[in-house]
């Protein structure tokens, strides 16, 4: 069930290399047909400039997730294709060395440093989620396969009316949780 009116972005069969993030706007369904393969670069600098995000419960401006939406309504990612974030290329090694940046971010949150001053971009080490929705509503993720996330796989934050249905996640790096709703209401996750 997709609620959009604007239209579909259809990714047909084939391998598509992406250098940088893909930003979803309102009323759009990103539809991956069978045997469509989105292959992200897996290189940290390709996911700059920083975007408003949340990392383990603390807001910041950091590396963009591979697929990102902010304040969008009626958005979907559907189909039978595959999204490969290539999280192991560069990001996997970060889990061992991100402790100081993680601690610095948490201290900034505890001290109530304004989010706009919590900048963790180039030269910092906090892995991004693969797919993140920030402050969005009426979201559908259905049927796709997601591989090799650098961190949490699907991460809705401050969202409402989220459906995640019949997806496959194949990711074996540290913290590759499947779906991590944070401060989000009306969420349905089902096979």
Predicted features and spans:
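Extracellular/periplasmic carbohydrate-active domains that bind, remodel
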Residues: 1-191
């Amino acid at each position: 069930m997709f609620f959009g009116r604007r239209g579909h972005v259809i990714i047909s069969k084939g391998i598509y290399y992406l250098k940088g993030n893909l930003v979803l706007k309102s009323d759009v369904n990103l539809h991956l047909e069978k045997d469509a393969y989105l292959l992200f670069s897996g290189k940290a600098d390709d996911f700059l400039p920083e975007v408003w995000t949340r990392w383990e419960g603390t807001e910041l401006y950091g590396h963009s997730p591979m697929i990102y939406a902010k304040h969008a309504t009626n958005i979907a990612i559907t189909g039978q294709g595959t999204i490969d974030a290539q999280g192991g290329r560069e990001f996997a090694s970060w889990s061992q060395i991100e402790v100081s940046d993680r601690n610095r971010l948490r201290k900034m949150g505890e001290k109530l440093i304004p989010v706009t001053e919590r900048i963790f971009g180039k030269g910092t080490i906090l892995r991004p989620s693969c797919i993140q929705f920030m402050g969005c509503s009426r979201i559908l993720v259905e049927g796709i396969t997601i591989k090799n996330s650098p961190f949490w796989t699907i991460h809705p934050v401050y969202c409402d009316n989220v459906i995640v249905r019949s997806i496959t996640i194949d990711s074996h790096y540290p913290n590759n949780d499947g779906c991590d709703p944070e401060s989000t209401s009306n969420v349905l996750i089902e096979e």
